[in-house]
Every structure is written in C-alpha cells, then in structure tokens.
C-alpha cells in the first residue's frame, strides 16, 4: 500500500476573510489522485461546519422590501451585507446578537454585540450608513450549519418580524485540484495531487484539509470490516428445495417406506410435521423404523426432528 506525504507549498493571506494554501500530496498510485482530490473537494465544500447569521429583526421593519428613514441602504441591501458577515463559533452552538447605533455613523461589524462564544473575523465589514440622528436597531440569530441554507418563506420566524437570510455556512469558499503523473526513483509511474484551498478566514486551509480527512476516514471506516448478513431469500429457496425431496431419496427399508406411505407421508416436508415420538406411534412403524428415518434425515439432509410429541395424531 502506498504511503503518501502531504506538504503545504504555498500559503497567503490577502485579508482577514481571504486565506489561501496550496498542498502537494505524493506519491499516489495511478488513479488515486483524481479519486482523492474529488473526495476532498466535495468534503471541504459540503461537510465542514460554519457559523452565519440566519435571521434578522430590524426595529420598524416588517418586510425585506422596506426602507428605513435616515438609512442610506434599503433593508434588502442590509440583509445582503449581513449575509457576508464571517463568524466563528467556539462551541458550535446558536446564539443571538444585537446592534444599536445612533447616527450619523458608518455601521460596521465592529458595532455588533455578539455572544461570548462567537468570534467576529473582520470588524471592518460594512453594514450601513446612518444619516442624521436616526437610530438603527436590530436583533439577529446566529446558527452553526453546513453548506448553503436557503430562505424558507413560510417559516414561523416571519410571524415575529424576523427576516430570514440565505445563510452561507461554508468556511471553504473554493477548492481546486490537479493530478499529474510523476516518476519514482524506481522509474515507476505514480501520481502527484495538487490541492488549492481558499477559506473565509474562520478556519485555516490546513485545518480545513485536516477536518476533511477526518470526516472521510470516519465515513469509510465501517467498510474496513464488512460483515454481510446472510440473504434470507437464499435460505428460503434452499429450504424449499429440501422440502420437495420425496421419501424415496432417503433410501429407507421396504418396511419403513411402506409404513410412511400408508400414513400419507410422501416427502420430507410431510416428515417435518412429525416429531420422533410421532414416528414411533405410526401404525406398524416401531422404534427401529423410526431410528432409521431419523438417521437418514440427519446424515443425508442435516435435518434433526424434534424429540417431543406434537399435536398431530395418526
């Protein structure tokens, strides 16, 4: 089995909300580069948890197409700005934040009052501009999730003046990968995987790749030891075939065979209705014939008749 190494060959930060790293994974067997690259890309984009504002209640506002006196932006623009706010939850739970600013002022994320367990990544993100002495007051809900959460228009939150936001939980903004052939020291053709990861600053690309690897490992671990349950249908078919076997196949003595026939026992299925005690009580059968039948069933078909007497009478 090939053991590969991973190395971060480039890492930059162009801002508080734009982290980038480039990784190299090698050596891989042929075909593994695309397999691993695609799995990591999907996991990085879809399965990592992030934190975002999901709903906002603004004082004096009833719907997202409203305007607020003294505020340069309309409500829809404010919601779009709040959608871009990057947060990080230390314990992965939801919370409630607030904002109250009196103008004139330029409102940024630095004005947000957040729960202690939630961290603001960029305090300079723009939210709105207040003209004059007007007040912008709002309350917003913060949640942790995965992927992209579309607004549910019929949610109960609309009844209490909360305006929902299309929340972007994804801490990873973009992933690229490239697989190419390389030659080993033994002149074997192997593969090198290059992985590029961009994040929003709430997580380092290195940590993101590490989390993605852990998620994939936990996902695939059950496949390491697979214990398939037997197919019940196959067992039923096998039992059906055995039950259809005629008593002629048991190669019994003439006496035992004739006694069974007179008792209307023509197949193994008929015999299974009897216990060992029931066989002895068949007319003219006796202990010796019963033992012969019991022995034939056990040796030829692996069937053991119960010893106790059943309710069947002959």
Curated annotation (Swiss-Prot):
Q: Does the keyword Nucleotidyltransferase apply?
A: yes
Q: Which terms in the GO cellular component ontology are assigned?
A: chloroplast; DNA-directed RNA polymerase complex; mitochondrion
Q: In which broad location class does this protein mainly occur, judging by the first location in its UniProt entry?
A: plastid
Its BP terms in the Gene Ontology are: DNA-templated transcription
Q: Write out the GO MF terms.
A: DNA binding; DNA-directed RNA polymerase activity; protein dimerization activity
**Where do the record's region annotations for Alpha C-terminal domain (alpha-CTD) lie?**
237-314
Enzyme class per UniProt = transferase
Give me the ranges of the annotated region Alpha N-terminal domain (alpha-NTD).
1-227
Q: Which reaction does it catalyse?
A: RNA(n) + a ribonucleoside 5'-triphosphate = RNA(n+1) + diphosphate
Quote the EC number. Answer: 2.7.7.6
Nucleotidyltransferase keyword on record:
yes
Per UniProt, which keywords does this protein have? Chloroplast, DNA-directed RNA polymerase, Nucleotidyltransferase, Plastid, Transcription, Transferase
Cellular localization per UniProt: Plastid, Chloroplast
Family matches, as Pfam families:
RNA_pol_A_bac (PF01000), RNA_pol_A_CTD (PF03118), RNA_pol_L (PF01193)
Q: What is known of its domains?
A: The N-terminal domain is essential for RNAP assembly and basal transcription, whereas the C-terminal domain is involved in interaction with transcriptional regulators and with upstream promoter elements.
Q: How does it assemble?
A: In plastids the minimal PEP RNA polymerase catalytic core is composed of four subunits: alpha, beta, beta', and beta''. When a (nuclear-encoded) sigma factor is associated with the core the holoenzyme is formed, which can initiate transcription.
Function according to Swiss-Prot or TrEMBL:
DNA-dependent RNA polymerase catalyzes the transcription of DNA into RNA using the four ribonucleoside triphosphates as substrates.
Family, according to the entry, reads as follows: Belongs to the RNA polymerase alpha chain family.
Question: What name is this protein filed under?
Answer: DNA-directed RNA polymerase subunit alpha
Per the UniProt record, the source organism is: Pyrenomonas salina
